[in-house]
From Swiss-Prot:
Residues 1-53 are annotated as: Disordered. InterPro entries: Ribosomal_uL15, Ribosomal_uL15/eL18, Ribosomal_uL15/eL18_sf, Ribosomal_uL15_bac-type, Ribosomal_uL15_CS. Part of the 50S ribosomal subunit. GO terms for cellular component: cytosolic large ribosomal subunit. Belongs to the universal ribosomal protein uL15 family. Residues 21-31 have a biased composition (Gly residues). This is Large ribosomal subunit protein uL15. Keywords: Ribonucleoprotein, Ribosomal protein, RNA-binding, rRNA-binding. The gene is rplO. GO terms for molecular function: rRNA binding; structural constituent of ribosome. PROSITE patterns: RIBOSOMAL_L15 (PS00475). GO terms for biological process: translation. Binds to the 23S rRNA.
Length: 144
């Protein structure tokens, strides 16, 4: 068996009906669109969210919240990712050099996920309580 010899089982595929090709086809003349009306015309149809003139749901509900732009430049770093860094000092620059963070990240926070095996010094990063305890238990330290 080769990839170029594969084909669907006999009768598994139905060919689509061609629209507007005579009354004998079953989908001639109006081509399944019915008679007249907005949906029968070329380019016809109502916009997304339109409810026939009734006040649509997206306008009935109040606006709320916003998207913080800070989230685009902030990242979380897992404990097990700290072992991928060269040396035993972890900073924002060393995390970027190890391809753990992208170049546009400006803030990072170490979170308790996975485990840290070696003693590392975390410098200039925010650290959660659980992650701080795990780093210090492994013999590491946190510097501001």
């Amino acid at each position: 068996m080769r990839l170029n010899t594969l084909s669907p089982a006999e009768g598994a595929k139905h060919s689509a009906k061609r629209l507007g090709r005579g009354i004998g086809s079953g989908l001639g003349k109006t081509g399944g669109r019915g008679h007249k009306g907005q949906k029968s015309r070329t380019g016809g149809g109502v916009r997304r969210g339109f409810e026939g003139g009734q006040m649509p749901l997206y306008r009935r509900l109040p606006k709320f919240g916003f998207t913080s732009m800070k989230s685009a430049v902030t990242a979380e770093v897992r404990l097990n990712e700290l072992t991928k860094v060269e040396g035993n000092v972890v900073t924002l620059e060393t995390l970027k050099a190890a391809n753990i963070l992208t170049k546009d990240i400006q803030f990072a926070k170490v979170i308790l996920a996975g485990e840290v095996k070696s003693a590392v010094t975390v410098r200039g990063l925010r650290v959660t309580k659980g992650a701080k305890a795990a780093i210090e238990a492994a013999g590491g330290s946190i510097e501001e």
